[in-house]
Amino acid sequence: MYEYINGLITNIYPAYLVIADRSGVGYKLFVANPYRFEQNVESHVYVEQIVRENEMTLYGFIDENEKYLFNKLLNVSGIGPKSALAILASDDAAGLVTAVANDDASYLTQFPGVGKKTAQQIVLDLKGKLDDLALSAGMTVETVPTTDNQALADALAALESLGYSAKDVAKLQTVLANQKDTTDGYIRSALKFLVK
């Protein structure tokens, strides 16, 4: 197993790059976007080795967070290394983390090779598992919008604790924001709206 490779990036191709270590061995690393790396520059590339029946493949990453996200994506049913790299190539890790946190499967369908079922599976499998990535990378996850109306804020928090998705709660906030009511009144109005 390799954790990372320090070396000179000797070649860059559309799907992979070649990095030569100090002993002169060149490693072919499949990467999400090879053009983020510079040719003929000493680099520190994080690596994940995947062994299949008849092949051993190395995948390279620009930082530890990208590698972490790659491994989390591999744990999703229906996502293989190539699909995970295609998702990472969008360079929108924050968008991915936010979409998972907000149960927004429709956002995930914009990634190559991700259909509706796979997007729903990503949300299901990764929900709550990317929070540590968001914190370590300094990402801000956009969840339920905040409000100055304390009664509305309490009602929205109560609805979320009842199991309603952050996306539904955010919609409710826009619907209920123009009303003046108690926390109980907001919850009743929200439940009526949700049952429609």
Swiss-Prot record:
The reply on keyword Phosphoprotein is: no
Its primary localisation, in coarse terms, equals: cytoplasm
GO cellular component terms, semicolon-separated: cytoplasm; Holliday junction helicase complex; Holliday junction resolvase complex
Which UniProt keywords are listed?
A: Cytoplasm, DNA damage, DNA recombination, DNA repair, DNA-binding
Return one GO MF term: ATP binding
Ranges where the record places region Flexible linker: 142-146
Q: Which family does it belong to?
A: Belongs to the RuvA family.
State whether it acts alone or in a complex, and with which partners, per the record. Homotetramer. Forms an RuvA(8)-RuvB(12)-Holliday junction (HJ) complex. HJ DNA is sandwiched between 2 RuvA tetramers; dsDNA enters through RuvA and exits via RuvB. An RuvB hexamer assembles on each DNA strand where it exits the tetramer. Each RuvB hexamer is contacted by two RuvA subunits (via domain III) on 2 adjacent RuvB subunits; this complex drives branch migration. In the full resolvosome a probable DNA-RuvA(4)-RuvB(12)-RuvC(2) complex forms which resolves the HJ.
User: Anything noted about its domains?
Assistant: Has three domains with a flexible linker between the domains II and III and assumes an 'L' shape. Domain III is highly mobile and contacts RuvB.
Protein's name according to its UniProt entry:
Holliday junction branch migration complex subunit RuvA
Q: What is the taxonomic lineage of the source species?
A: Bacteria, Bacillati, Bacillota, Bacilli, Lactobacillales
